[in-house]
């Protein structure tokens, strides 16, 4: 994927960049793999805002992605690379030898016409999915399961990858994109290669309207709110925070406060924290 720069014909276009979509080979999605997706605008079942600054945006259909890859030893041909509005990565349309179609995350380097497989004894090549027990140490992987059979949950964003560092008994040791090193059961599956569309992080939105197309609403600073809306609010003019530390809208410290539970059951699987230098 390349980055397309726009001429400064307006102020909004001046610093705007976007994808050139050079990798995309098909513009209309596969109808059988689409489901409707209703908007929540950041509200829960009671209609109360649980996530601020969300609402509006372009209407989308959800693409059913196969994160499990349990159709073993049936070769699938890559028919197209498509855009997915619901994620940063592109997706690949697979057609299996028995005629079944499915979407997967498009790894870096995957081309139309390539054949991919899943199973214990498949080749170590980009797009193939295997249990961690069958993947050589040092291999770059993505779409990693946390529980066997649940489907990939880790390393799914554009340009991300993890590396298999070693194996100890029934656990594999993996270094994630964040730098965290953790143990995962060797019976969990992962896909070979890094996620494609790696230049996604270089895109500059350029104008407020483009953020609105994505369903993101404006964000106000706490210091310009009233005291009943935010701990930083109130005062005459540009008043200071007036507290020992900056606060979240709910009165929690925002600088250095640990949010992870010390009793989290998964702590024992973390070999090295992502926060350690």
UniProtKB/Swiss-Prot annotation:
GO molecular function ontology, one term from the record: transferase activity
Source superkingdom: Bacteria
The family this protein is said to belong to: Belongs to the universal ribosomal protein uL2 family.
Function, in words: One of the primary rRNA binding proteins. Required for association of the 30S and 50S subunits to form the 70S ribosome, for tRNA binding and peptide bond formation. It has been suggested to have peptidyltransferase activity; this is somewhat controversial. Makes several contacts with the 16S rRNA in the 70S ribosome.
Biased composition (Basic residues): 210-219, 259-277
Protein name: Large ribosomal subunit protein uL2
GO CC list: large ribosomal subunit
Complex and partners: Part of the 50S ribosomal subunit. Forms a bridge to the 30S subunit in the 70S ribosome.
Keywords assigned by UniProt, alphabetized: Ribonucleoprotein, Ribosomal protein, RNA-binding, rRNA-binding
Source organism phylogeny: Bacteria, Bacillati, Bacillota, Bacilli, Lactobacillales
Transmembrane segments: none
Positions of the UniProt region annotated as Disordered: 210-277
Record-level GO BP terms: cytoplasmic translation
Family matches, as InterPro entries: NA-bd_OB-fold, Rib_uL2_dom2, Ribosomal_uL2, Ribosomal_uL2_bac/org-type, Ribosomal_uL2_C, Ribosomal_uL2_CS, Ribosomal_uL2_dom3, Ribosomal_uL2_RNA-bd_dom
PANTHER family: LARGE RIBOSOMAL SUBUNIT PROTEIN UL2M, RIBOSOMAL PROTEIN L2
């Amino acid at each position: 994927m390349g980055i397309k720069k726009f001429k400064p014909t307006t102020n909004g276009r001046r610093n705007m960049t976007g994808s050139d979509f050079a990798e995309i080979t098909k513009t209309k999605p596969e109808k059988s793999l689409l489901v409707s997706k209703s908007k929540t605008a950041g509200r829960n079942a009671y209609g109360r805002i649980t996530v601020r600054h969300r609402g509006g945006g372009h209407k989308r259909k959800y693409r059913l992605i196969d994160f499990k890859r349990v159709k073993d030893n049936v070769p699938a041909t890559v028919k197209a690379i498509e855009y997915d509005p619901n994620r940063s990565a592109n997706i690949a349309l697979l057609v299996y030898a028995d005629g079944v179609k499915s979407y997967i995350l498009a790894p870096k380097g995957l081309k139309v016409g390539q054949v991919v497989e899943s199973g214990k004894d498949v080749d170590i090549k980009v797009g193939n999915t295997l249990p961690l027990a069958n993947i050589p140490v040092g291999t770059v992987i993505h779409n990693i399961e946390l529980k066997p059979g649940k489907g990939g949950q880790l390393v799914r964003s554009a340009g991300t990858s993890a590396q298999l560092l070693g194996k100890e008994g029934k656990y594999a040791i993996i270094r994630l994109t964040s730098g965290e090193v953790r143990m995962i059961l060797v019976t969990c599956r992962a896909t070979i290669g890094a996620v494609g569309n790696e230049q996604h992080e270089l895109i500059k939105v350029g104008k407020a309207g483009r953020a609105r197309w994505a369903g993101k609403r404006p964000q106000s600073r706490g210091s310009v709110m009233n005291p009943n809306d935010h701990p930083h609010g109130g005062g005459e003019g540009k008043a200071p925070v007036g507290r020992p530390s900056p606060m979240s809208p709910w009165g929690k410290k925002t600088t250095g406060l640990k949010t992870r539970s010390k009793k989290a059951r998964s702590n024992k699987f973390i070999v090295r924290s992502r926060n350690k230098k």
